[in-house]
């Protein structure tokens, strides 16, 4: 969540990240880290997701032949390790990596790696793929053109999907948010948070706050209008990780369990993600006080038009594992 908040506060445009993919890379680094370096990585790691159905997570380690890698690290990553010569054939290795990523994301992530320096000693790649249908699917014939307010004064025409059904919904008026849970098949769901004041809600957003809103939600009959969208994002994670407390890997790290080479440090960590939300589903390569309106007895249907910037979270329902986090300010399809 902290990495996500970093990007929310550093850009006004759309944001999309996968904590799962980021954690897969950090987990490989942790296998070779000791001391403070290892402690920082542990604090930043999300839980492991390998047991989740319909989620494909894969990682691969490319080590240069010049790097003296310890047997302990080799044993830990043995099924994912490939010995290469970055100095001799960086272009070929780049193409091999891009083919590997494309194959594991159903060709949704292409050209994941733009270039590789001949001086590279170790390169770690992680890929995630998620494709699940809505439990209650939108009907394409009911998708219409609608207005989406990018700002208070500027709007654009988008493809607005419509559906009337029972959803978990909450209107937390004293915090200025509405939230709806859109269920997928196989025990996943998307939480859509529609803030009155986007910047204010983003500043105070936390996992515990989201959980508290969900606990306040009730099953309501909702007339929902929701924009169809897709986006692809690309980030360098160095600064975001540093603000989350992961600093040592970039300067003077302790990778004692990986190698005796004291000059090995992480130069950059890149992250690329893709999501597509349609009528059929999604493809994507605490206790807090709240005033919730209680209508009592039979409640009137809710009319919810998601026609302004919103935050979304794709989660595993049983574990509340966060697979993807995003903000949509200007939907495109």
Curated annotation (Swiss-Prot):
N-terminal signal peptide: none
Gene behind this protein: SERP2
Role, per record: Weak inhibitor of the interleukin-1-beta converting enzyme (ICE) and of granzyme B. Does not form a stable complex with ICE, but can for a stable complex with granzyme B.
Ligase recorded as keyword: no
Similarity comment: family membership: Belongs to the serpin family. Poxviruses subfamily.
Name of protein: Serine proteinase inhibitor 2
Keyword Glycoprotein part of the UniProt annotation: no
PANTHER family, per the entry: GH10112P-RELATED (PTHR11461:SF211), SERINE PROTEASE INHIBITOR, SERPIN (PTHR11461)
Site label Reactive bond, positions: 294-295
InterPro entries the record matches: Serpin_CS, Serpin_dom, Serpin_fam, Serpin_sf, Serpin_sf_1, Serpin_sf_2
Subcellular location field: Host cytoplasm
Entry's Gene Ontology BP terms: symbiont-mediated suppression of host apoptosis
Entry keyword set: Host cytoplasm, Host-virus interaction, Inhibition of host caspases by virus, Modulation of host cell apoptosis by virus, Protease inhibitor, Serine protease inhibitor
CDD domains: serpin
GO cellular component: extracellular space; host cell cytoplasm
A GO MF label: serine-type endopeptidase inhibitor activity
Organism: Myxoma virus (strain Lausanne) (MYXV)
